[in-house]
């Protein structure tokens, strides 16, 4: 009876998730960053690899075109991996009329990383200027890994979320797009289980709350070593009134104590969704975007697909 109940609950959870919205054209992506250009509404999608892949489309559904790389020569940061940049996060600042892209230079599986930033007037290939490191790195062996940057403005003040594995996700105030404020980073989320698999923070505001989304679980190599069911990537959410700390999930559990309400997990042919973000679509409203493996196409990183779903809201919590 107990096993039957668990199976029923698992099937109910799987059936609760909507399939990704349509995508046409070049639909490959990995750790996507997504932004809709202010001037004409054109979408630009950024992805891990090389000098950060750029694709663009007239709408979120496509047709997507592969445009090239944001930084074709890699980063000016003198660090291993500066020709293979990770986890782009893009935002626009009205006061400078520029787009800013944070990226990570890192060594896979090690706490050996640097976060850098580039800027552009248009987001087009050929328009990006690399500014190098923002001063956030692991040279002093901190409790965090400096990858997966995510910019957020909280009550008018800019901040950066970042972190992967180790002691989890941290937040630090920014002085400007290129410099940290002189305040130490503080932890906002942590996963005590499965080798502390938590990363890819993305924070956004809705109503009176700030919502912190993150990916939890094993984030790749599924074609080589498939993890146990439920240990692959999935997307979770906590919320906070202040946006800087005290994030809790729907049950009230702290995000610093392995909390996190599941927003999206494997279902049907959708496997291991993660690397997520939220975009404000001019027509659709708030949209969750992410990468996932389509079981009908393959489980390798080169097979990953771009996924998106409109957010629904019930009692102050998002769902898809």
From Swiss-Prot:
Glycans are attached at residues 73, 137, 191. The keyword Coiled coil does not apply. It comes from the Eukaryota. It catalyses: Endohydrolysis of (1->5)-alpha-arabinofuranosidic linkages in (1->5)-arabinans. InterPro entries: GH43_arabinanases (IPR050727), Glyco_hydro_43 (IPR006710), Glyco_hydro_43_endo_a_Ara-ase (IPR016840), Glyco_hydro_beta-prop_sf (IPR023296). GO terms for biological process: arabinan catabolic process; xylan catabolic process. It is found in: Secreted. One of its GO terms (cellular component) is extracellular region. Residues 1-16 form the signal peptide. Keywords: Carbohydrate metabolism, Glycoprotein, Glycosidase, Hydrolase, Polysaccharide degradation, Secreted, Signal, Xylan degradation. Pfam families: Glyco_hydro_43. The record marks 148 as: Important for catalytic activity, responsible for pKa modulation of the active site Glu and correct orientation of both the proton donor and substrate. Its EC number is 3.2.1.99. The active site is at residues 31, 199. GO terms for molecular function: arabinan endo-1,5-alpha-L-arabinosidase activity. Endo-1,5-alpha-L-arabinanase involved in degradation of pectin. Its preferred substrate is linear 1,5-alpha-L-arabinan. Belongs to the glycosyl hydrolase 43 family. This is Probable arabinan endo-1,5-alpha-L-arabinosidase C. The gene is abnC.
